[in-house]
């Protein structure tokens, strides 16, 4: 008789274990980060380790390389961060901070894992040594100024030509 009483109990435990087995893979899948989320977490780590006064924010993320499906395997990443106006001591997220005009730009390379439970990254960042990065900013600003100047000149020519049209006397 004791065996019969424990029989349904054993069946319930089997059912509970079966349900847990079905639910656990879903919980594991939910802990996998997207490529960009993993990079943003790495940037948070960079900001925590940095001795610079201000936070850095993602400026450019290189295209995602082809990867295997294992979230525990380190994935190669490369991206660019730029200094923001927010001090490191702020509680703001870097995404909520504006970029600092002429802020320091750093090129970062390394690896991240997409498994949120492991949350590991190995990233190193160096000053962006692209010589023409600031030159590009110069040309953008010059283009705006020249565009505004040409617009003003065009308006003056239009006004001048409008005044040359013979007026009819009434």
Swiss-Prot record:
Region (Active core) residue spans: 150-162
Propeptide: 31-131
Record-level GO cellular component terms: extracellular space; vesicle
GO biological process, one term: neutrophil activation
InterPro entries: Cathelicidin-like (IPR001894), Cathelicidin_CS (IPR018216), Cathlecidin_C (IPR022746), Cystatin_sf (IPR046350)
Signal peptide interval: 1-30
Keywords annotated in UniProt: Antibiotic, Antimicrobial, Cleavage on pair of basic residues, Disulfide bond, Immunity, Innate immunity, Secreted, Signal
Protein name: Cathelicidin antimicrobial peptide
């Amino acid at each position: 008789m004791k065996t019969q009483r424990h029989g349904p109990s054993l069946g319930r435990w089997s059912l509970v274990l079966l349900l847990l087995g079905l639910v656990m893979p879903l919980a594991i899948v939910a802990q996998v980060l997207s490529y960009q989320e993993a990079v943003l977490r790495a940037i948070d780590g960079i900001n925590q380790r940095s001795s610079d006064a201000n936070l850095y924010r993602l400026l450019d993320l290189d295209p995602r390389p082809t990867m295997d499906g294992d979230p525990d395997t380190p994935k190669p990443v490369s991206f660019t961060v730029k200094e923001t106006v927010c001090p490191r001591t702020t509680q703001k997220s870097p995404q909520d901070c504006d970029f600092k005009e002429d802020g320091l730009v750093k090129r970062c390379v390394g690896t991240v894992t997409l498994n949120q439970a492991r949350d590991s990254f190995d990233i190193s960042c160096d000053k962006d040594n692209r010589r023409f990065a600031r030159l590009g900013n110069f040309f953008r600003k010059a283009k705006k100024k020249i565009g505004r100047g040409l617009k003003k000149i065009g308006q003056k020519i239009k006004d001048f030509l409008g005044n040359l049209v013979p007026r009819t006397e009434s």
